[in-house]
């Protein structure tokens, strides 16, 4: 959202995870070429990847990989599809998709982690934020959300995910209100979009937004060379 760079209190809670326990990735998503299937039940696959050896810039900040490359890797890891950057499209709202496979996509990266959300039935947005000291930014966001108290980093992640999934922009965000946190999907005042979020580990927040409630299949990769594994207990604490 382009907030001024300075924190907020942590959101608490864990995701309500649907689905099975750990399973190896690579093609289990079941998406076929030219298969948009707009009427089939929506399922969201969310892959979190650890990137432990990213280079740093002159200021010591960790440099992130491109969104396109992260999406390509996620589609391959989760669905086993041999896509390239040329298969990716962005619409007028800067939302990613893979039209040949009917996938909508969103990508986020923060510090040494990335998250990619994929769905063949729902419009999705994902965001990652870490805990940093930025009280001015959180007070500003709290006021924008119509609150008397500062926003949290979890709120920040939810706002960013909503912008990525919807027609809302940073310039038209005034008037958006987030529902009080609870496990699972919650309706926003930007219909039909719904939001869910989790505090992952000690200082990382993940938010998902979709245009409908849908089961979430969580995936984890310990590195680029690792296989994606299904998990019903997504956490970054052991990473």
What are the language-model segments listed below?
Residues 2-239:
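Core catalytic alpha/beta fold that binds nucleotide/phospho-ligands
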């Amino acid at each position: 959202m382009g907030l001024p760079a300075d924190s907020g209190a942590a959101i608490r809670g864990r995701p309500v995870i649907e689905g099975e326990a750990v399973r190896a990735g690579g093609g289990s998503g079941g998406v076929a070429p030219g298969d948009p299937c707009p009427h089939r039940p929506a399922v969201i696959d969310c892959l979190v990847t650890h990137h432990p050896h990213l280079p740093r810039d002159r200021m010591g900040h960790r440099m992130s990989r491109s969104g396109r490359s992260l999406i390509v890797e996620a589609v391959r890891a989760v669905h086993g599809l041999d896509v390239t950057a040329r298969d990716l499209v962005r619409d007028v709202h800067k939302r990613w998709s893979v039209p040949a496979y009917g996938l909508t996509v969103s990508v986020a990266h923060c510090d040494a982690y990335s998250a990619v959300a994929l769905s063949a039935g729902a419009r999705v947005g994902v965001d990652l934020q870490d805990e940093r000291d930025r009280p001015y930014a959180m007070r500003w966001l709290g006021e924008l959300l119509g609150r008397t108290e500062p926003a949290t980093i979890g709120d920040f992640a939810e706002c960013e995910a909503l912008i990525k999934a919807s027609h809302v922009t940073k310039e038209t965000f005034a008037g958006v209100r987030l529902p009080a946190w609870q496990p699972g999907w919650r309706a926003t005042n930007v219909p039909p979009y719904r939001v869910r979020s989790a505090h992952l580990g000690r200082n990382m927040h993940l938010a998902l937004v979709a245009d409908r409630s849908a089961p979430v299949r969580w995936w984890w990769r310990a590195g680029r060379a690792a296989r994606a594994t299904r998990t019903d207990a997504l956490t970054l604490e052991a990473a």
